[in-house]
Curated annotation (Swiss-Prot):
It is found in: Cytoplasm. It holds the Pfam family RBFA. This is Ribosome-binding factor A. One of several proteins that assist in the late maturation steps of the functional core of the 30S ribosomal subunit. Associates with free 30S ribosomal subunits (but not with 30S subunits that are part of 70S ribosomes or polysomes). Required for efficient processing of 16S rRNA. May interact with the 5'-terminal helix region of 16S rRNA. It comes from Cupriavidus taiwanensis (strain DSM 17343 / BCRC 17206 / CCUG 44338 / CIP 107171 / LMG 19424 / R1). One of its GO terms (molecular function) is ribosomal small subunit binding. Belongs to the RbfA family. GO terms for biological process: maturation of SSU-rRNA.
């Protein structure tokens, strides 16, 4: 997932609006039973607003399959965004599974395991 360091306030506002609109559209417009519970984590835009990386997590479905489905439906979602957003360029959407949550869970598990081992060694 990209950092929001040197990004213009306009870029951030548009990213946030795209994230909100896409989250609603995925829930209401995409009625694909293969999709699980999709949560959009962030949207990062290129400086020219031509491309948007949309990072998501999913529960109840395979992440790779969900990514493929979302990228397959990206054109449809783009057309819906075009109708909602009042900007000159609506970015091309690129969906990516966000693995940072899984990494955080794994790191937490490893820390807890190390602490448990240390406690046993001290006893």
């Amino acid at each position: 997932m990209a950092k929001k360091g040197n990004i213009s306030s306009r870029n951030l506002r548009i990213s946030d609006q795209i994230q909100k609109d896409l989250a609603e559209m995925i829930q209401r417009e995409l009625r694909d039973p293969r999709l699980g519970l999709v949560t959009l984590q962030s949207v990062t835009l290129t400086p020219d607003y031509a491309h948007a990386k949309v990072y998501f997590t999913v529960l109840g479905a395979d992440a790779a399959e969900t990514e493929a489905i979302l990228n397959e439906k990206a054109g449809y979602l783009h057309s819906l965004l075009f109708k909602r957003l009042h900007i000159h360029t609506v970015p091309t959407l690129h969906f990516h599974h966000d693995t940072s949550v899984e990494h955080a869970i794994e790191m937490s598990r490893l820390i807890n395991e190390a602490n448990a081992t240390r406690s046993k060694d001290e006893d």
